[in-house]
Amino acid sequence: IGAQTYACPVYEKVGFVRTDYAYIEDGIPHVRMIQELA
């Protein structure tokens, strides 16, 4: 997913990990995240 950087801690609590550098989308900082499925 492309998560807004301020929301990353929420996604990390449910198993997502950051995979890339921050980027700007629509004027808002985002970071790419993935969640591996077991």
Regions found by a protein language model. Give the residues of each.
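Aromatic-lined ligand-binding clefts that engage carbohydrates, nucleic acids, or primary amines
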Residues: I1
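C-terminal "cap" of GNAT-fold acetyltransferases
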Residues: Q4-C8, I24-A38
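A secondary-structure capping/hinge motif
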Residues: R18-D20
